[in-house]
């Protein structure tokens, strides 16, 4: 799922009904929105036979393209209407320019190169829980505080079917958990602190640049 980033949130821009190509022509946004039944299904495991097919490789390419066009930092197959357990993740440096060094440090946010993970299994590796704003390409225009594990390990396959294991903390761990939730039919609004839910412009206007402790205090959450 895409995670949004306006200051404290995961995206630089919310997704509209259409997107513009570099040539200026409008194209239909392929990312399905909350309410679509595929976002509430447990996605199917990708079989060994499926992995090497042109169709599956084309799906991965479409996921990467949609994530980058949004722009977002992650996207799961169900967000393109495909019930398969696969996601892509990439947090490019240019998506972090609106954040101060203090914000980047607090979020433990660093650039992450493109990763494709198929049939992921996520395990928390510490008891630490961390709360920050999240948004989603499938819940366009909104954000809320969500508590997640501070450090996790994911195991699965890459797009070529090779085993991968990745232990990660901070912001990449948040993105990863957000995307795996999509594969289980879970959207971030299921986990959010409901009193913190608001539009992206409201969240940006009130909380951009503020430490998370001050934000939580202002919103009346612990």
Model regions: which residues?
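Bacterial N-terminal signal peptides
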Residues: 2-13
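Generic structural signal for short, solvent-exposed loop/turn connectors between secondary structure elements
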Residues: 1-2, 195
């Amino acid at each position: 799922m895409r995670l949004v980033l306006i200051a404290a949130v995961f995206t630089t821009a919310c997704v509209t009904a259409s997107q513009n190509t570099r040539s200026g022509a409008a194209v239909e946004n392929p990312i399905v929105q909350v309410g679509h039944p595929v976002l509430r299904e447990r996605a199917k495991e990708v079989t060994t036979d499926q992995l090497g097919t042109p169709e599956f490789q084309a799906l991965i390419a479409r996921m990467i393209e949609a994530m980058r066009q949004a722009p977002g930092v992650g996207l799961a197959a169900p967000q393109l209407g495909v019930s398969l357990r696969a996601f892509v993740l990439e947090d490019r440096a240019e998506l972090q320019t609106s954040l101060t060094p203090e914000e980047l440090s607090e979020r433990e946010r660093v650039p992450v190169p493109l990763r494709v993970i198929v049939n992921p299994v996520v395990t928390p590796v510490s008891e630490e829980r961390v709360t920050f704003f999240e948004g989603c390409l499938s819940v366009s225009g909104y954000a809320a505080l969500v508590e997640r594990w501070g450090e996790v390990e994911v195991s699965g396959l890459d797009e070529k079917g090779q085993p991968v294991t990745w232990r990660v903390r901070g912001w990449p761990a948040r993105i990863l958990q957000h995307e795996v939730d999509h594969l289980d039919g879970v959207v971030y609004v299921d986990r959010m602190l409901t009193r913190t839910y608001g539009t992206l412009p409201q969240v940006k206007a009130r909380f951009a640049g503020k430490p998370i402790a001050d934000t939580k205090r202002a919103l009346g959450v612990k």
